[in-house]
From Swiss-Prot:
The GPI-like-anchor contains a phosphoceramide group, rather than a phosphatidyl group. Its main location: membrane. Glycans are attached at residue 67. It comes from Dictyostelium discoideum (Social amoeba). This is Ponticulin-like protein D. The gene is ponD. A lipid is attached at residue 125 (GPI-like-anchor amidated aspartate).
Length: 148
């Protein structure tokens, strides 16, 4: 009986650590509605004042709006991403101009610890080490309970 409780405790700790990962970096993928041409790694076609504009490989921040089906793309502001993967219509805000996306596009979010920008100067190594120590401690505690 005590072994079952310890295993449940271990599973709960692992789940808590995994779900604590935050997502803010994202990549937008889509297809040109006119030519069906795709761009690698990503492409978005937006319409502003009747003109079709292509945005290829756009990275930025995702912000939830009051509408649960739309999000704001904010290139330089702080923001959070709703989840690791989602598909929705977006309202983009490059250069502080609202641009409505003409189609439903995919939003692929990257975990903050795996930022695609390659900037390692943020000092996230200490938080990663703290997370590893905490998870190792939780596993040790669960194993000790299992041995009792």
């Amino acid at each position: 009986m005590l072994l079952n409780k310890s295993l449940l405790l271990l599973v709960a700790f692992v789940f808590a650590i995994v779900s604590a990962t935050t997502y803010s970096e994202f990549k937008i993928t889509g297809t040109n509605p006119l030519t069906q041409e795709t761009c690698d790694p990503s492409i978005v076609y937006t319409s502003q004042n009747g003109a079709c504009q292509g945005v290829c490989g756009m990275f930025g921040k995702l912000v939830a709006t009051s509408n649960s089906t739309q999000f704001n793309v904010e290139m330089y502001g702080s923001a959070g991403c709703v989840g690791p993967l989602g598909t929705t219509g977006l309202t983009c805000l490059p250069n502080e101009q609202v641009i409505k996306v003409t189609e439903t596009i995919s939003v692929v979010c990257f975990a903050d610890k795996d930022e695609p920008s390659g900037d390692d100067s943020s000092g996230d190594d200490s938080s990663a080490a703290a997370t590893m120590i905490a998870s190792f401690s939780a596993i040790l505690i669960a194993l000790l309970f299992a041995l009792l």
